[in-house]
Curated annotation (Swiss-Prot):
Pfam families: ATP-synt_ab (PF00006), ATP-synt_ab_N (PF02874), ATP-synt_VA_C (PF22919)
Keyword Ribonucleoprotein: no
Cellular compartments per GO CC: plasma membrane; proton-transporting ATP synthase complex
Name of the protein in its database record: ATP synthase subunit beta 2
Cited NCBIfam families: atpD
Gene name in the database record: atpD2
C-alpha cells in the first residue's frame, strides 16, 4: 500500500499539469449556493469537509476547493461522516491545502468533454487537455463519468469476428466485435506493444473511433504513444485519456470512467463503432486498493479492497454494445509475479470473452508476439461463428504444440534422436508452427528494420494446415520465423537454398584438393552456426 503522503504529487510536472486544469475544474458542474462548506481535515489525498447548512452533497458528487496561488483542487465525495460532514478524495495534489479552506459542491458528478472536440487530443481524468493543443471551447458538450450500463433489452450480444491481422490471435483466440478481450502477462512480455499494434491495425482496418485509457502507466510510455500516433496519422480519430503513475490514486481510479464516458457518447449519440483500449486494468484495481486503504476500509485477500469484485464488475458491465453501434474493449492486464491465481487477475478474467495469455517462456525464446497458443482461449472459437475448418485447424495446432511441450523434458535429457519417428515428426511440425505464428509488427518497424505484416485469417489457416500436413517438413525453421503468409516463408526458404547453393559452389571452386568437411553448417536465414543434427529435421 502506498504511503498516503506520497500521493500529494507536489512535483513541478504535476503543478504544470494542474495549472492547465483550472477551466475544467470550474466546469465539472453548476455550483449551488447552498453547497458551501469548509475543509476540517486533510490526510494526504483524503479531505474531510463540513457543511454548516443545507443538504450534504451526494456520493460521487464533485467538490471544488480553491487554493491560494494554485489551481482549484477537484475532489469526489466517498462517504457521509455525519449529518454535516463528508469525506472526499482529491483527484489532484493537495499541496497547499489548509483547514478552513472554502469548498463548493458542484451539484453533480465529474463531467468531461465529449464529441469531435476531443478527437486527436490527450486529456486528464477531469477532461483537461494534456497536450500542446489549444484549450477546449467553453461550450463543448460534457457528460458525467458515472452512469449505468444500458438496459439488458437494449444490449446486443457479441458474435461477429473482429479480425486483427495478428495470426496467433485470429487463429487461436479470436476477438469479438462488441466484446471484451484481455491481454494477460507479467512485466516485460509485450502487453503494451501488442495493444499499440492493435490500435494501429484497428484504425487502418475499421476506420472507427479509438479511445485509449492509460491507467497508472509510465509517463514516458504515454508520451511515446502520443508521438507514434501523430507520426502514423491515426491520432485524428483517437482520444487519449491518461492518469499516469505519478498521479494520486483517485485520478488513476477514475480514468477508465472518463474514457468510458467518451466512448459511450460516440456509441449512443453518433452510432459509431468504438475501440476502447485500456492499459493497464490491473493499475485500476491497484488504485482502488489504495483508495480503500485511504478511506479506512479493512483489506481483503492479498491486501486488495473488499469491494474488488463489485468495482471490476461495475467497470466491465458498462462496456456494452447496442443496436447499430459496438464498443469493443481490449484490455492489458499486468499479472503480478506471473501469478494467474491473483484475485485481481481472476476477477478481471471472469468478464472477458477472449483471453490472450502472454508467456515469459515464449518471450525468452524470441517468439514474438509472446502469446501462449495453449493457454489463450476465446468463446468465439466455435464452428457456428468461425466455421468448421477454422476450429479444426486451431484444435490440431494446440494439440501438436501441447504434445511437443510434454516431450521437451525427454528431449532435454535424452535428445531428440531417442524419440520415435512419429514423435520426431510431430516435434518438427510443432517448432515450425511456433515460428510461423510469430509476426513482425508495424509499431516495432523503427527498431527491427522489418516491415510489419497484417495477415488475413484465411492465409493463417492455410499456412497452419500446410505445416500440419507436412508440406514444410524439409524447410528450415528459420524460414518460417517472423514472416506474414506461407508464401513469404516459401520465398525466404527459396532464397536461403539459393544462397546455400552459391556458397557450396564457391567453396568447391576454392578447394585445391579433395573437399573437406566441416562439423558445422551455417543457417543463412538466422546468421548463426549450429551443429549438424541440431535442427530437428530442418
Amino acid at each position: 500500500m502506498a504511503d498516503p503522503q506520497a500521493t500529494n504529487g507536489t512535483g513541478a510536472a504535476c503543478a504544470e499539469r494542474d495549472a492547465s486544469d483550472v477551466g475544467d475544474v470550474s466546469d465539472v458542474g453548476d455550483a449551488r449556493d447552498e453547497g458551501a462548506g469548509r475543509v476540517v481535515a486533510v490526510r494526504g489525498a483524503v479531505v474531510d469537509v463540513a457543511f454548516d447548512g443545507g443538504a450534504l452533497p451526494a456520493l460521487n458528487e464533485a467538490l471544488t476547493i480553491p487554493v491560494d496561488g494554485a489551481s482549484p483542487i477537484l475532489a469526489e465525495v466517498h462517504a457521509h461522516l455525519s449529518d454535516a460532514a463528508v469525506r472526499a478524495l482529491a483527484l489532484g495534489p493537495t499541496g497547499g491545502l489548509r483547514r478552513g479552506a472554502a469548498v463548493r459542491a458542484t451539484g453533480g458528478p465529474i463531467r468531461v468533454p465529449v464529441g469531435d472536440a476531443v478527437l486527436g487530443r490527450l486529456l486528464s481524468v477531469t477532461g483537461a487537455p494534456g497536450d500542446d493543443g489549444a484549450a477546449l471551447a467553453a461550450d463543448v458538450e460534457r457528460r458525467p463519468i458515472h452512469r449505468g450500463a444500458p438496459p439488458l433489452a437494449e444490449q446486443k450480444s457479441a458474435n461477429a469476428l473482429f479480425a486483427t491481422g495478428i495470426k496467433v490471435i485470429d487463429l487461436l483466440a479470436p476477438l469479438a466485435q462488441g466484446g471484451k478481450a484481455a491481454m494477460f502477462g507479467g512485466a516485460g512480455v509485450g502487453k503494451t506493444v501488442l495493444v499499440m499494434e492493435l490500435i494501429h491495425a484497428m484504425v487502418e482496418r475499421y476506420r472507427g473511433i479509438s479511445v485509449f485509457a492509460g491507467i497508472g502507466e509510465r509517463s514516458r510510455e504515454g508520451h511515446e504513444m502520443l508521438l507514434d500516433m501523430r507520426g502514423s496519422g491515426v491520432l485524428g480519430r483517437t482520444v487519449l485519456v491518461y492518469g499516469q503513475m505519478n498521479e494520486p490514486p483517485g485520478a488513476r481510479w477514475r480514468v477508465p470512467l472518463t474514457a468510458l464516458a467518451i466512448a459511450e457518447y460516440f456509441r449512443d449519440e453518433r452510432a459509431q463503432n468504438v475501440l476502447l483500449l485500456m492499459d493497464n486494468v490491473f493499475r485500476f484495481v491497484q488504485a482502488g486498493a489504495e483508495v480503500s486503504g485511504l478511506l479506512g476500509r479493512l483489506p481483503s485477500r492479498v491486501g486488495y479492497q473488499p469491494t474488488l469484485a463489485s468495482e471490476v464488475a461495475a467497470l466491465q458491465e458498462r462496456i456494452a454494445s447496442v443496436e447499430g453501434a459496438a464498443v469493443t474493449a481490449i484490455e492489458a492486464v499486468y499479472v503480478p509475479a506471473d501469478d494467474f491465481t491473483d484475485p485481481a487477475v481472476t476477477a478481471i478474467a471472469a468478464h472477458v470473452d477472449s483471453m490472450v495469455v502472454l508467456s515469459r517462456a515464449m518471450a525468452a525464446e524470441g517468439m514474438y508476439p509472446a502469446i501462449d497458443p495453449v493457454a489463450s482461449s476465446s468463446i468465439l472459437l466455435d464452428p457456428l461463428v468461425v466455421g468448421e475448418a477454422h476450429v479444426e485447424v486451431a484444435i490440431e495446432v494446440r494439440r501438436v504444440i501441447e504434445h511437443y511441450r510434454e516431450l521437451q523434458d525427454v528431449i532435454a535429457l535424452l535428445g531428440i534422436d531417442e524419440l520415435g519417428a512419429d514423435d520426431r515428426r510431430l516435434v518438427g511440425r510443432a517448432r515450425r508452427l511456433q515460428r510461423f505464428l510469430t509476426q513482425p509488427f508495424a509499431v516495432t518497424e523503427a527498431f527491427t528494420g522489418q516491415a510489419g505484416a497484417s495477415v488475413e485469417i484465411a492465409d493463417t489457416i492455410a499456412g497452419c494446415r500446410a505445416i500440419l500436413r507436412g508440406d514444410c517438413d524439409d524447410w528450415r525453421e528459420s524460414s518460417l520465423y517472423m514472416v506474414g503468409t506461407l508464401d513469404d516463408a516459401r520465398r525466404k526458404e527459396a532464397a536461403a537454398r539459393e544462397a546455400d547453393a552459391r556458397r557450396e559452389a564457391a567453396a568447391a571452386a576454392s578447394v585445391a584438393g579433395p573437399g573437406t568437411t566441416s562439423g558445422t553448417t551455417s543457417d543463412p536465414a538466422s546468421g548463426s552456426a549450429e551443429p549438424q543434427g541440431a535442427r530437428h529435421g530442418r
